Amino acid sequence: IGMNFWNSVFELPSFLILAMFLELLFVPAFGFWSNIQRNEYKYKALVLVTLEMSLANPLLGIVTVLSTIYKAEARILSMVFVQVIFGLFFYILIMYKGRRFYDKKYWKYAFLFNAPLIPHYLSMTVLQQVDRIMINNMVGTSEAAIYGVAYTVSTLMILVTSAMNNSFTPFTYQSIKKKNYISIKSITNLILIIVAVGCILVMAFGPEVISILAPKQYYDAIWIIPPVAASVFFMFLYPLFGNIEFYYEKTKFTMMASCVGAVANIVLNYVFIRIFGYHAAGYTTLACYIMFAIA
């Protein structure tokens, strides 16, 4: 498959395609290292590195954007540069500590564990992106932009839920190992209440956020916020069960549930966007995440 194929698929120039693949190659190294830090409760180093990346990204972006007329390209490449530099450092660090590139036992285990997760993560990408693509193709670009604004505001809670899940996952694994199931139950109930309240607050104040930050032509987005904000609760609900499936290496169940949810989202969008317009995509998203969470 040549570069022209990827250019046609993503509708992007070659240098941005290469930048994207470089980021995909190096970003996992930081993910591997950060997961180790979380599981060993070594948060000081993780927080320090995260702050360094958070500062380097915008600072380099400002410098590069102000230094060229190609503003958008400069911002993208500066962001990729930061990710690649940090990723390269952690790749070298991991390889140095591991001192061994190939180990048949671990490679086989990693392949068997992660192979079913490839369709799972592709399906999750479909669930997150297909709405806007289908609205763009079936209704129009402006409606896709309005939906995108509503989706961004509605999913603000994901910043919180992702941090909560990253912290809760090591605790879950260690509690299962110690057979301390009661602590998992009590903390799970508490954080579910916190997330539910957060989603309700987004529903309540999301329209005000749009009215303040977006021009009038985007005000129609307020009707999409409630279902998409409710979807965030079920996005968070799934990993609580999924982490347990991961612990017991039952990744095939995760794959099947996510694939069903992704296919259902495409079908429901195709049917209901034609009938009710682009607003229907918010409700099909909610229905599919509910289906995904209970599957």
Tell where the protein language model's regions lie, with residue ranges.
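Membrane-interface junctions at transmembrane-helix termini in multi-pass inner-membrane proteins
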Residues: 26-48, 94, 98, 229-260
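Alpha-helical transmembrane segments of polytopic membrane transporters and translocases
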Residues: 116, 131-133, 143-161, 190
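Interfacial segments at transmembrane-helix termini and the short loops linking adjacent helices
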Residues: 4-20, 204-233, 239, 279
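Helix-loop junctions and terminal segments of transmembrane helices
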Residues: 1, 154-178, 188, 242-247
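Hydrophobic alpha-helical transmembrane segments
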Residues: 18, 47-96, 259-264, 278-295
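Small-residue hotspots at the loop-to-helix junctions and early N-terminal turns
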Residues: 17, 141-152, 221-226
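Interfacial transmembrane-helix starts/ends
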Residues: 111, 148, 179-205, 222-225
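Interhelical loop/hinge segments that connect adjacent transmembrane helices in multipass membrane
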Residues: 44, 48, 72-79, 88-128, ...
